[in-house]
Regions:
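Conserved small/polar residues in nucleotide/adenosyl-binding loops
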Residues: 120-128
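Short, surface-exposed connector motifs at secondary-structure boundaries
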Residues: 79-85, 104-107
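Residue-level recognition of alpha-helix initiation/capping sites
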Residues: 70, 92-94
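Fold-independent oxyanion-binding glycine-rich loops
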Residues: 57-59, 91-92, 114
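Structural motif
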Residues: 52-55, 85-88, 108-111
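Charged, amphipathic alpha-helical linker segments immediately N-terminal to NTP-binding catalytic cores
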Residues: 94-119
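A generic secondary-structure micro-motif detector
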Residues: 65, 88-90
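Gly/Thr-rich phosphate-binding loop signature of adenosyl cofactor/nucleotide-binding cores
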Residues: 1-80
Length: 128
């Protein structure tokens, strides 16, 4: 499956780009499915669906807020080393600076939306 260019999805769904200087050409979404990476963010990567768009909602976000900087660095580095098409933070949740730094190092685009995870997922499925 060829997929859809991320630039098209960003424009169509009015996503906020969190890493402004990241080039999006060549980044494609090949699967219409998404993944909520709660288990991966807690360290469990068996059966990880890395080819899916990764959606960070309130559950994932509040879990990350309970980690110290060393724990965050470890999990962000591990999570973002995979060939992820992009990560989207829902409900206007803001990724922290360390997350953005690790994403940039691994060339993983990070976006935001004011929509809830359910509404974003529904809108995205329509576009893909």
């Amino acid at each position: 499956m060829e997929g859809v260019g991320i630039e098209k999805i960003v424009k169509k769904l009015q996503l906020k780009k969190y890493i402004e200087d990241m080039e999006l050409k060549g980044h494609r979404i090949r699967l219409a499915d998404v993944n909520r990476p709660a288990l991966q963010l807690s360290g469990y990567f068996e059966h990880f669906e890395q080819s899916r768009v990764q959606i960070i909602g309130m559950v994932e976000y509040t879990y990350l807020q309970h980690l110290n900087d060393s724990e965050k660095d470890s999990i962000y580095s591990r999570f973002l080393k995979y060939d992820i098409p992009c990560v989207i933070f829902c409900r206007d949740l803001q990724p922290d600076d360390l997350f953005l730094q690790r994403a940039k190092e691994n060339n993983v685009p990070v976006f935001g939306t004011g929509r809830s995870c359910l509404l974003y997922t529904s809108d995205a499925a329509d576009e893909l």
